[in-house]
């Protein structure tokens, strides 16, 4: 049957976690107050504000309080969909203004080209919004990589630690579990993907927690698909 698709985690796998934590997150925290003030009547932003109130159980929270909640969620690395949507919108401005480029490990840049040439389908699965993923790969320091991807998945697909999220991905891409390889640095994500029947591989970069349970690679150069 063989592998026909590869699903990759982003932070810690295709992208340096430090870029997320030291560049993107602080940028969104700093930009949130002005962004919400200026865009609060935009339908998408307005929906995110309402969803934030609902999740926080603070239906009467004013804009300043909503901003505080969102900034607190950033510090907690909360995987809340309204936060991730707003971060994607804010980062779009930053990328567009040339304030930063998306960091992609060089070995993945070469690998995604190789996988594409092999007619393998390539997907990303991140707690960051689909829009944020597209921005990362389109404004990367390796150029625009988006045309090599077949799709992207985010929290709307499910929690990355839950088996059901990976079942949902399989249903969406219409492949059997053994035809799909999931690559991540996070053990709990690999366990969830394995529970859904997917093939798995742990990316072990410098700061990655190691385990004997999964096949390991330290670079996409080592991931050869026949």
Curated annotation (Swiss-Prot):
InterPro entries: Enolase-ppase_E1 (IPR023943), HAD-like_sf (IPR036412), HAD-SF_hydro_IA (IPR006439), HAD_sf (IPR023214)
Enzyme Commission number(s): 3.1.3.77
Entry keyword annotation includes Ribosomal protein: no
Pfam families, per database record: Hydrolase
Enzyme's top EC category: hydrolase
Cofactor note: Binds 1 Mg(2+) ion per subunit.
Pathway annotation: Amino-acid biosynthesis; L-methionine biosynthesis via salvage pathway; L-methionine from S-methyl-5-thio-alpha-D-ribose 1-phosphate: step 3/6; Amino-acid biosynthesis; L-methionine biosynthesis via salvage pathway; L-methionine from S-methyl-5-thio-alpha-D-ribose 1-phosphate: step 4/6
Gene3D superfamilies per UniProt: 1.10.720.60, HAD superfamily/HAD-like
UniProt keyword annotation of Magnesium present: yes
Main function: Bifunctional enzyme that catalyzes the enolization of 2,3-diketo-5-methylthiopentyl-1-phosphate (DK-MTP-1-P) into the intermediate 2-hydroxy-3-keto-5-methylthiopentenyl-1-phosphate (HK-MTPenyl-1-P), which is then dephosphorylated to form the acireductone 1,2-dihydroxy-3-keto-5-methylthiopentene (DHK-MTPene).
NCBIfam families xrefs: enolase-ppase, HAD-SF-IA-v1
Quaternary data: Monomer.
Sequence similarity: Belongs to the HAD-like hydrolase superfamily. MasA/MtnC family.
Official protein name in the record: Enolase-phosphatase E1
Protein species of origin: Shewanella baltica (strain OS185)
